[in-house]
Amino acid sequence: IDTSVGRLGVLVCWDQWYPEAARLMALAGADLLLYPTAIGWDPEDVQEEKTRQRDAWVLSHRGHAVANGLPVLSCNRVGHEASPLDASGIDFWGNSHVLGPQGEFIAEAGTEATLLVVDVDLGRSEHVRRIWPFLRDRRIDAYADLTRRYID
């Protein structure tokens, strides 16, 4: 999506888990990756499980930033939503964040509703891509099987 601040690569909710989707956005010229989402956990999960889930979510975003040399902005909802199918519903964990093109935290919200206002240096991506030329050095001739659901 072309905007006044640059080209946004938007991956909504579940799509943000796929590194291929982030890579396609980078190859299409995205200046930053934007991940609007609504992710949380079952309130009955033990704390260790909650921590594992949230940490995996953040780690995947950091990996997308590094692998593509792009900032990642992830905005997640907060609060509880009851479910007619499940008595416990879902607790949304918040933790919206802004990452730089090397996966570093620029800003992070907590578990409450928060407005983050952040300056992101989009020019840094080019510098990072010179240090780590992952897009240049990828072996596209070896990736044909990515278009198949399973490899026989």
Predicted feature locations:
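Active-site beta-strand termini and strand-to-loop segments that position acidic
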Residues: I1-S4, P101, V120
